[in-house]
Amino acid sequence: MKQKKVKMMSKTIAVHCGHGVSLDGSWDSGCVYKGYSEAKLMLAITKAAVKYLRASGVKVQSDADHGNNKNMIADVRQANNSGVAMYLSIHCDYSGAPRGVMPLYVSGSGKKLAKCLEKTIKKDMGMKSRGVQKRTDLWELNGTDMTACILETGSIKGDLATLRDHPDKYGKAIAKGVCSYLGVPFKDGKKKPSKDIYHVRKTWKDEKSQKGAFSTLENAKKCADKNGYSVFNSKGKEVYHGKK
């Protein structure tokens, strides 16, 4: 099977949540443990991953947008028909599985994606890894026409606290791994606070009296004390009155 290598950020990728609606339309919870289901746990993580990927400028196709309402056959068909550049399916392993993340792949490009995911998840989540593993018996790997990876995020029993309590953090780690694979700078969507400039003047309107403009308030205060002037922020508000 020849799989495409992603070359540009403008390509759309598919990120889907494991299990959910089954082939006959009934609900497929995936593995379960003490009232927790794979489908529900993975939905929260997938939503977070999609959120951070979109914040990083990546176009994402995902069943998480609609409550995990499609089965994997439909997910793969949609991905193939729309020509997405990459396919990722997010799962967790059954209660008897060992702890640790385990990305699955079948192609060379899939292995590269798996390693990117393993690296960021181990680092950001502090999780053990069961290694990246090649599988040739899974539909989401064999049926896709593009780079594909099935991510086993951990054991529903052994890693329950991580999966249940930190979905946003886990989704962020996944998004970082995907961005690393795509060669796209990761962005968390948070606007960095703008740095204010502090002006030392007699009054805000008296621009000619300005003794200096500073990026730090402490330095502006020293200048104001020396000259008996005031400190104004970029909006003209007096934030400090000199002591001289």
Which positions does each model-derived feature cover?
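Short aromatic-glycine-(Arg/Gly/Cys) micro-motifs in beta-strand/loop hairpins
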Residues: 193-208, 229
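A short, glycine/acidic-enriched catalytic loop
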Residues: 20-37, 93-120, 124
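Active-site-adjacent mobile loop/cap segments within catalytic or ligand-binding domains
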Residues: 14-16, 22-24, 80-82, 86-93, ...
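Short, mixed-charge low-complexity intrinsically disordered segments
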Residues: 228-244
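A short, charged, amphipathic alpha-helix used as a generic interaction element across diverse proteins
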Residues: 215-230
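Long, well-ordered alpha-helical scaffolding segments within enzyme catalytic domains
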Residues: 44, 48-54, 110-126, 160-190
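Active-site histidine-acidic residue metal-binding/catalytic motifs
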Residues: 2-74
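Loop/turn elements at helix/coil->beta-strand transitions in domains of secreted/extracellular proteins
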Residues: 10-11, 53-60, 82-87, 124-128, ...
